[in-house]
Amino acid sequence: MVIFMKKLSVKSFLLLSVSLAAVILNSCTNSKKLFVAEDLTAENLFTVNIEGPAFDKNGQLYVVNYQHDGTIGKVAPDGTCSLFIELPEGSVANCIQFDSKGNMFLPDFTGHNILHVDMLTEKVSVFCHEPLMYSPNDLCMNSKGQLFASDPDWKREIGQLWRIDTDGKPVLIETNMGTTNGIELSPDEKTLYVNESVQLNVWKYDVDEKGNISGKKLFYKFDDFGLDGMKCDKNGNLYITRWGKGTIVVLSPEGKFIREISLKGKKCSNLVFGGDKGKTVFVTLQDRKGMEKFENNIPGKKY
């Protein structure tokens, strides 16, 4: 290196330094800042019940309650929105979940149903009906196609958990809980996380190969605001929407606080990982009736 530097003239050295600085500056300018929220859609395109963002296998983003309750909307990468389907009269979805075949599943909290949507025909049918469900709220799914559903009763501030098997049979797997809301499986599918919005608890369960849960433990306890949707990244960290505070808290698999990401809106209801590398987080905001997004350092668990 010393020999090379001696052979360079002062002018050549200065030109090389300027060029290198320009490359570094250009790289920094083009890179996106991490954990900084920005608008994805305009405000007031959805209802106050905007929820459950999910990507299909082709990378199309879907969100519930576009323009009025009882609909599913589509969101383009540039933030423009359009209507996908109207649900049967009286049905209102609160979440979207896709299986490995591309089928869409929706918790219909007004009809005590889990709905199925054929993405080719856009036909909506009842996959599971259970009168004992309070108001199915959020869903997650394992690689076998089993659904796990949170089921709160907001008036009585209680809740329960269901597993819906691939044949549509509902199995009550937990009772006597608080207002169960956000629900998520760890990347290895051995842990189920469930939060209680009013009681501000996040619980964890062991999950066996048949989808049975056991070993309930308190994973994390919050002191204020509310809790809503949750998602895991590829490393198993859990991202929790803090409804009313306008932040997303990231916890390690051991339940340790990692960071808190501020949003522009306050009533964040759910989130999903997406983008080319799975490192963009898309968030639904009920007070803004629209969506925000931010860049993350780790991709979602499906990437």
Predicted ranges, named:
Residues 4-14:
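Bacterial N-terminal signal peptides that target proteins for export
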Residues 26-27:
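C-terminal motif of bacterial Sec signal peptides marking the signal peptidase cleavage site
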Residues 30-47, 216:
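A short helix->beta-strand "capping" segment at the edge of beta-propeller domains
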Residues 39, 82-86, 125-129, 171-175, ...:
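Beta-propeller fold detector
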Residues 44-60, 88-108, 113, 130-160, ...:
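Beta-rich, blade/repeat-based domains predominating
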Residues 63-85:
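Beta-propeller domains
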Residues 71-73, 113-115, 160-162, 201-203, ...:
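A short loop-to-beta-strand structural motif that recurs across blades of beta-propeller domains
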Residues 75-80, 118-122, 164-168, 206-211, ...:
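Short loop/turn segments that connect beta-strands within beta-propeller blades
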